[in-house]
Amino acid sequence: MNLETMRIHSKAPLPGGIQDRNEKNRPSLKSLKADNRLEKSKYKPLWGKIFYLDLPSITICEKLQKDIKELGGRVEEFLSKDISYFVSNKKEAKYAQTLGRVSPVPSPESAYTAETTSPHPSHDGSSFKSQDRVCLSRGKLLAEKAVKDHDFIPANSILSNALSWGVKILHIDDIRYYIEQKKKALSALKKSSASGKDAGKKAGPGIQKTRTGRLKKPFLKVEDVNRCYRPFYLQLPSLPCINYFLQKPCSPFDIEKSSSVQKQAQPKLRINMDGDKCGTPVQLQLKEKRKKGYCECCLQKYEDLETHLLSEKHRNFAQSNQYQVVDDIVSQLVFDFVEYGRDTPQKKRIRYSVGSLSSVSANVLKNTAPKEKPLLEPNFQKDVGESSGHLLKPNSQYEETQKPEEKHGFASEPTTYSSAGLKGCDRKPVSMFNASEPDPEQEYAQLPLRDSTPEHQVTEGRNDGEQRVDPAPGVSQSCGQVSHLSTESNLPQPQLAADITQLSAKDLQEKGFHVVIGHASDLVALNTSKEQLTMKARTPPCSPQEPHECDTENMENLPCGKIQRKVRMLLGQQKANAEPSAELDKKRTEYLPAHEDRTCGSPVQSLLDLFQTSEEKSEFLGFTGYTENSGICDVLDIWEEENSSTLLSTFFSSPSTSAFVGF
């Protein structure tokens, strides 16, 4: 068989009327026929046709099934004899129809009449057949058909079964081409019919259907006079009442349900209705929003708390004796609550500044026996005394407990030591000129006056001696308490007052200095003023046998306050350093007389050495003094003219205008 002829037959369009031989034997197809078959075939060309799709692709199968249903066809899921067309995408489907039907009992006549009785006559006739086939025997024809079926259509396949049942076989390309042609024809037909309907509508009168009805009273209806817009309406359950007393943003037709919302949405500003021509807005005094709540005592809700508390029901509950037992127990408890920090008054921090330096002159006298008891008794003897290992006692026993190696001194500026400074003195030295915040535990007693004169006595327990200094006229008086300097701290003692005795009185008078030198001087005082520095000196020292004469001569010129030493010892190191301290005392007494004849050093260096220490755990406990037999002048070194103005300016500043920030 020629393959070109097979392609021509496969591309031929489907015939309009498909007739089956066994139509009478198919009762299911009779139900599909109807009287209006011609009308439906016009818009549904596949009406009454049943298709079976043998396609592996689901997407293509669904699309083709949709197109078939639009054209009036029906798709079955199972292959049977009732199927009209078998659609497949296999190659055998293109030429399977040209082979004719394979009869179960083939005969010589069937092969001859196969093409003539076929419902699909070929366009080119039976040109591919020859007259020799008529002369073929029955065996040859059977063998030829068996070879053809074996080569092109496999046995026992769906395609062979469809051929044996007489089902028309179509390729997918053929059915697609047929559907496209029918869609184009239907679209053209619909356009022509739609144009005819439009022409008929334009020719006829324009009648518009309207939905009419009756509104139930009461209602509101708004209509357009020109009738260009449709009316809108609103049916109400009851006729609203107009309220003229509502404020401006609210509608006069508001229902009572919105009254609560209306109160919450009151405006803050409104125009005065009484006739302010400028229309200035007046701010309304809105009432405070009442907070609703629930009373657990009365077991009821309330709108306002104050009104509920004043109600009779709540007052009866509050005045009842149900909780009298609890009140009695609470009244027996001890009130030991700590005051809250917010309630306690805040204490202002006192700031200290170095003001004008009080100029004093000192003369130290030695007495063999104490005559008076000390007048200053600190209130913190217990705290400081226990921590330092010494109790400050205002009697002779306290004076006897003092070591002869301990040194004492005066300070003209009021100085206090904080608790942090006392506790942490083993880590950092205490400075007299940079006082910290006063400790509330350190309270000093008031210095009483003696014989109506501003005279004060200083009693120090050093070698059972007593030292007295009196205030000088015209000089501000102040006393500072100084801690004693232990021998454990290796301070440069010889450099504190470096041999001032070598200076002659003549040199001192040229520079305006007067030196007061005592035989057993342990206290150093400097008398300064803003104009000049004056120191009154007596070169012949007082003998130990005449202490009262020296005392009476200098009592009028020596200012002083009552000074009580603060003693603090390191208890942990007291025993460990007992022997080294004794050796240091011996070396100290030997070292001081050896350097009596040295010349004075720089005044700045001597002042810096005053606050310098050589150990990390040492503490500043007072100005130093010397032994009885030293005979050294304990007056500070002479100020040089070029350095005196700059150095003294730090001490002559007013405490109200400036603050001391440090050296």
Curated annotation (Swiss-Prot):
Record text on subunit structure and interactions: Forms a complex with CDC7. Note that CDC7 forms distinct complex either with DBF4A or DBF4B. Such complexes are stable upon replication stress. Interacts with MEN1, MCM2, ORC2, ORC4 and ORC6. Interacts (via IBM motifs) with PSIP1 (via IBD domain); phosphorylation increases its affinity for PSIP1.
Residue(s) carrying Phosphoserine: S311, S353, S358, S412, S614, S656, S658
Annotated Basic and acidic residues bias: 20-29, 400-410, 452-469
Function text: Regulatory subunit for CDC7 which activates its kinase activity thereby playing a central role DNA in replication and cell proliferation. Required for progression of S phase. The complex CDC7-DBF4A selectively phosphorylates MCM2 subunit at 'Ser-40' and 'Ser-53' and then is involved in regulating the initiation of DNA replication during cell cycle.
Motif (Integrase domain-binding motif 2 (IBM2)): 644-663
InterPro entries the record matches: Replication_Regulatory_Kinase (IPR051590), Znf_DBF (IPR006572), Znf_DBF_sf (IPR038545)
Keyword list, A-Z: Cell cycle, DNA replication, Metal-binding, Nucleus, Phosphoprotein, Repeat, Zinc, Zinc-finger
Record protein name field: Protein DBF4 homolog A
PTM comment text: Phosphorylation increases its interaction with PSIP1.
